[in-house]
C-alpha cells in the first residue's frame, strides 16, 4: 500500500442520482456517527439534494482510489432549519447567493485541509456560475468547521436558535 494518497478534488457527475449520490449519502451517514454531538451536523437527505439540484449546484468529491472520502455540496437553493431564506438574517441578494450546504470528510482523512480546499474550490466554481456571495451555517461549538469557515474569509452574520438547532450563519463576497 502506498503512503501517498492523491487528495485532488473532482467534480461528481450526477447522471443516475440513486446510484451517483449513494456514496455521498453513505459518507454523510458515516461522518455523522463520528461527530461528538448530534447537533453538529444534519445530513442532507436524498430528496432534498434532488430538489436542490433542480437549479445550479456544485458537487465535489475526493477519492482514495475508488472510495469517496470527502464531499462538498453547494446549491443556489438552500434554507435554514426553519425553512426561511438566509436573507431573513443576512443582507445579501438571494439571487446572487449560493448556499454551501455541506462539506464532509471521512474521519481517517481529517487534518489534510480538505474542508478549506473544498470551500475555496466551491467559491471558484460559484463565481464561474455568476454568483457573488456564498453563505453557510455551522454549530458554534463545532470548532474545526468554524475555523475552516472563518479561515476561508466568511464573516459571522448572526447566531440563531431554531428549534433544537443552534447555528452560526456566515456569508462572504466571492467577487474578485
Predicted regions: what they are:
Residues 110, 136-146, 162:
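Conserved beta-strand-loop-alpha-helix junction that forms the acyl-donor binding cleft
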Residues 70-102, 110:
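Conserved acyl-donor/pantetheine-binding loop and adjacent beta-alpha core of acyl/acetyltransferases
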Residues 126-138:
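Conserved GNAT acetyl-CoA-binding A-motif
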Residues 102-105, 111-124, 151:
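Conserved acetyl-CoA-binding loop-helix of GNAT-fold acetyltransferases
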Residues 161-176:
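C-terminal "cap" of GNAT-fold acetyltransferases
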Residues 128, 140-158:
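Conserved active-site alpha-helix within GNAT-family acetyltransferase domains
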Residues 37-65, 73:
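Active-site rim helix/loop that mediates acceptor-substrate recognition in acyltransferases
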Residues 1-26:
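Conserved N-terminal entry element of GNAT/NAT acetyltransferase domains
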Amino acid at each position: 500500500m502506498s503512503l501517498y494518497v492523491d487528495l485532488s478534488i473532482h467534480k461528481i457527475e450526477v447522471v443516475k442520482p440513486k446510484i451517483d449520490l449513494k456514496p455521498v449519502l453513505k459518507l454523510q451517514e458515516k461522518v455523522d456517527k463520528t461527530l461528538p454531538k448530534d447537533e453538529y451536523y444534519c445530513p442532507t437527505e436524498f430528496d432534498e439534494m434532488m430538489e436542490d439540484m433542480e437549479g445550479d449546484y456544485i458537487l465535489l468529491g475526493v477519492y482514495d482510489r475508488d472510495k469517496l472520502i470527502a464531499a462538498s455540496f453547494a446549491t443556489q437553493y438552500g434554507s435554514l432549519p426553519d425553512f426561511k431564506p438566509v436573507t431573513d438574517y443576512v443582507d445579501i441578494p438571494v439571487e446572487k447567493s449560493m448556499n454551501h450546504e455541506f462539506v464532509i470528510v471521512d474521519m481517517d482523512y481529517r487534518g489534510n485541509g480538505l474542508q478549506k480546499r473544498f470551500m475555496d474550490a466551491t467559491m471558484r466554481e460559484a463565481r464561474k456560475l455568476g454568483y457573488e456571495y456564498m453563505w453557510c451555517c455551522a454549530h458554534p461549538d463545532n470548532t474545526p468547521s468554524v475555523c475552516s469557515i472563518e479561515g476561508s474569509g466568511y464573516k459571522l452574520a448572526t447566531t440563531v436558535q431554531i428549534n433544537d438547532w443552534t447555528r452560526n450563519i456566515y456569508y462572504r463576497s466571492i467577487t474578485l
